[in-house]
Amino acid sequence: MTPSLLALLLLGAFVLHDGEETLMMQRWQQRHSADIMRRFPRLKHRLSHLASITTRGFAIAAAEEFVIIAAAAIMLFLGVPYAFYIVSALFIAFVVHQAIHLVQALILRSYVPGLLTNILLLPATITGLVYIIQTLTATQIAVCSAAGIVVMMVNLPFAHYIGRKLSQ
């Protein structure tokens, strides 16, 4: 594994995973949101906001996220200082995102959009994560993890906002 391969792995994994989410989310929401809101009433606000995003809106939201990952990869390919840390932070955030899907599937005891690619990509994401762990210090991993999660927490609502606006 090299930093460039890690960036390519992240790009490819993201395209596959978000492709599955984009293709499946709207139909899955229509079939399952009422049951989930009944079982988990505290999630009603979150689910109702996601239900208003069309497949086109999800695709646009995923494209916005892809631009961020692609920009980090390009920076790495061009040799921009610290770009490996940015790619590592985004890779770790992607792994956290995958873990969230696995937890959702376990809680719901059913398929959730993104689960299939999570399972198929597990060997590749573990390989990438092992590379990061072997390459960075514990402090660097902690900083990259925190930064990646913050970027994910800030950008995801923004991406969903764009998706909702362009779904109307």
Regions found by a protein language model. Give the residues of each.
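Hydrophobic alpha-helical membrane segments
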Residues: I92-H101, V112-I132
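Non-cytosolic membrane-interface motifs at loop->transmembrane helix junctions
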Residues: L106-L120, T139-A147
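Core segments of transmembrane alpha-helices
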Residues: R56-L76, L120-I126
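Transmembrane alpha-helical segments that form the membrane-embedded catalytic/substrate-channel core
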Residues: V15-L23, F94-A105, V151-K165
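Helix-coil boundary and interhelical linker segments in multi-pass alpha-helical membrane proteins
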Residues: M1-L11, A72-I86, T127-V143
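Cytosolic, membrane-interface loops and tails of multi-pass inner-membrane proteins
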Residues: T22-A51, K165-Q168
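N-terminal signal-anchor transmembrane alpha helix
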Residues: M1-R27
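Terminal transmembrane helical module of multi-pass membrane proteins
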Residues: T125-Q168
